């Protein structure tokens, strides 16, 4: 993507469309990196706040992992005991990988500070008579957090010097194209681009009626775990214990999760692997005092358009429709009736609107216009005139799979 952006700038392109239609997501860290590709400044660090539900099984797993990191578990008492627990060929590095989700040392708090212990991470915090962990953030400088060996998010690790790269496009010169089929990592990057970047959204399709439309219709959860992934991780934690501990854990949620059977009997399978899974992490908006998961927030696009017959056979007609509505002076008049200036959209002043309906005007890093999020609606901007109009856009599509198209 970095090469794509550099080429687009070298070719004199002035606008960018993120075509996120039909995007079911992918590796979460790519969503954060995508944001940094267009906002490389050091002060533009993606928030990406998440949390777990604070239940007993998670707490037990975190405590045992904390003991494992300190070399205090029964399985670490000698090599024979470890082999009896996990079998030949399994190393402590392997177990370190399986328990990484419960490792307090490889995540940061809401203020980008390290956790001193599992207990500090776990909390719990109480909201609406339910309990959750404290807010968690990725440590983008930590390879355990980024999941890809040798991969560095723009502005961190091997790409630290990228913070000196000029921002390739201003917020008003970028737009996201949605069709309702956006979930998971797609929702993550959309949240960052909208609320930290002030990038507007246009939605296409929907029911044949006037009014606004949400661009994101899929899950807005921060991370999904398959059933078998959860079970393997819990088993790794379980077998770190002594025989007496395991007997005790068998009667707890930890043991019941590690050795669940009925769930696997009833679930569908795909490619020889269980198809079921669960979203284990909420995605939280920066500055939202209510800490409402994004899953429960309504977010209308800044504009909406219907499909036309030419768009069905020619995708460039879709992109042209985006340009006409989002980058031209009178573009808003071409949007579906009643679909503009919704209070939850960027142009309607909804940047950083929390689940309680309140806006934190000081949340987040600087926007693409060099100012922090505010209550002032961002108006639709006019297109460049003359020759500039001929070089109006690049299109990025299939973002989470990192496939790209240009025109």
For each predicted feature, which ranges?
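C-terminal "post-core" interaction segments
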Residues: 1-382, 386, 391-398
């Amino acid at each position: 993507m970095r090469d794509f952006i550099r080429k687009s700038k070298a070719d004199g392109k002035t606008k960018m469309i993120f075509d996120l239609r039909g995007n079911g997501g992918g590796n979460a860290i790519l969503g954060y990196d995508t944001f940094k590709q267009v906002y490389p400044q050091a002060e533009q660090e993606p928030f990406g706040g998440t949390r777990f539900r604070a239940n007993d099984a998670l707490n037990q797993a975190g405590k045992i992992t904390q003991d494992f990191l300190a070399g205090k578990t029964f399985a670490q008492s000698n090599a024979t005991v470890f082999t009896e627990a996990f079998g030949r060929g399994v190393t402590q590095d392997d177990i370190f990988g399986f328990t990484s989700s419960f490792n307090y040392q490889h995540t940061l708090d809401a203020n980008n500070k390290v956790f001193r212990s599992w207990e500090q991470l776990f909390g719990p915090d109480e909201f609406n008579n339910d309990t959750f962990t404290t807010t968690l953030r990725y440590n983008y400088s930590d390879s355990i957090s980024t999941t890809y060996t040798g991969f560095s998010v723009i502005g961190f690790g091997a790409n630290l010097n990228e913070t000196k790269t000029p921002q390739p496009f201003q917020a008003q010169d970028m737009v996201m194209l949605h069709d309702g089929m956006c979930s998971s990592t797609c929702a993550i990057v959309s949240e960052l681009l909208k609320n930290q970047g002030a990038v507007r959204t246009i939605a296409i399709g929907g029911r044949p009626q006037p009014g606004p439309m949400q661009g994101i219709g899929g899950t807005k959860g921060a991370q999904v775990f398959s059933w078998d992934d959860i079970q393997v991780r819990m088993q790794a934690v379980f077998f770190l214990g002594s025989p007496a501990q395991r007997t005790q854990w068998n009667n707890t949620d930890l043991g019941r999760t590690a050795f669940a059977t009925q769930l696997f009997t009833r679930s569908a399978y795909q490619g020889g692997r269980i198809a079921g899974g669960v979203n284990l992490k909420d995605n939280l908006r920066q500055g939202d005092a209510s800490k409402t998961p994004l899953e429960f927030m309504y977010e209308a696009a800044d504009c909406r358009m219907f499909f036309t017959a030419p768009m069905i056979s020619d995708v460039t007609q879709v992109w042209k429709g985006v340009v006409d509505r989002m980058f031209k002076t009178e573009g808003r008049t071409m949007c579906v009736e009643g679909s503009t200036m919704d209070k939850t959209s960027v142009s309607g002043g909804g940047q950083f609107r929390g689940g309680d309906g309140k806006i934190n005007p000081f949340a987040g890093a600087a926007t693409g216009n060099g100012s922090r999020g505010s209550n002032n609606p961002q108006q639709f901007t006019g297109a460049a005139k003359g020759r500039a109009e001929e070089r109006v856009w690049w299109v990025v599509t299939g973002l989470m799979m990192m496939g790209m198209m240009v025109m």
